[in-house]
Amino acid sequence: MAPLSRVIIDTDPGIDDILALLLALSSRSDEIEVQLISLTFGNIDVRSCLRNVVSMFHIIEQELKWRRENGKPEGFDALKAFKPTVAVGADRPLDDELMMADYFHGRDGLGDIHYSHPHLTPKQAWESLFSLTGNGTAEAEVESALDGHHSSFVASKKPAYQEILRVLKENEPDTITIIAVGPLTNLALAAAEDPETFLRAKEVVVMGGTVNLPGNVTPVAEFNTYADASAAARVYALTSPRPQSTLPPLNPSAPKPLPAYPPTLSKQLTLKLFPLDITHPHDITRGQFRAKTAPIAAAGSPLAEWLSIILSHSFATLDALHPGHDGDKAALSLHDPLCVWYALTRESPLWTLSAGSPEDIRVDTTGQWTKGMSVVDRRNRKRRDDDAVSASDHGHWLSNLAGNRVQRMEGSPGTEVFGGWLLDRIFGV
């Protein structure tokens, strides 16, 4: 039976990214098939992102062994049915300075677990699988040092954007969903390299932006969009009947500006946007997490131990940063896992779009205070029936053919149920 969703997950693992990956990989094989995990800078540098993903697979292998030895259902059917490729991608934005969210996620992206609990991190030999160290380590030596702990994934030595295009070429059009939960740099590079192949995607599900809520990195910008605003603008532009109308201006200081898209393309990109407006209310509290995982960790679950260490850092950071986030009520928003939940349950009628979808949502790439802002036209202005250029329509906001066509997700199967459901799925209970 074909899975409901075949996906590429483009990610910058961080804490909620890891939860998103665990949710996907622990699901049923008839629900999802993770063909590629493409890594980008974001929450931390891309090398740390790679270490975090390899560590996750290392812990999953230990968890499966523990479950077998204790007579428990193994779970992780999606992972056992299809071994995903892992590819390293962009290490910096297209044309801006690198920024990270290590203030929240820790120096290593996972609450500093690699420093505080190094025994939970696999040996460094895994780097050679991805040609990152250049130390000439033989493949056999790498296999021996890893002791089988990369048996759940395929390591790619190609850039992530090339792997994205490969997966799209090897599958039928409109069968691959790209779930993008980090800066959109890898997607922008893939689209610039081969826009028609990129448009073979069924849809691109983006965790990014904020429309009616404040930002989380500036007063108006969400982190993923802010971290590479030009990349986000370029990907959003593919939803437009005329992508040139919303492409960001060229940055003359950029090392290698990406080319404009061809004047005509075969189709418009389907982009489902999950902004902070919908992701922020979906959370998990410290009390909820402890109640679910403490007995499992006490019984010896490697995964419960690992996640308990990581999330304890998150909840402590929330205590320090946000008034009201303390004790068992401290709540971690499940931004990235929500996008995976959609891929798993996309047929539910409870997933609803905004009344105005598709919306002309554009990304500001140059503003001193508004870079990364998701800009919408809140004026009560009538759109023009013709598509002629109008001197009074600055930015072509009122033209029928200009502007983006973004489908903004507004409703889900339930903010109250997701956190518990996520933990039940990951721990197989």
Each language-model region and where it sits:
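A conserved beta-strand->alpha-helix junction
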Residues: V86-R92
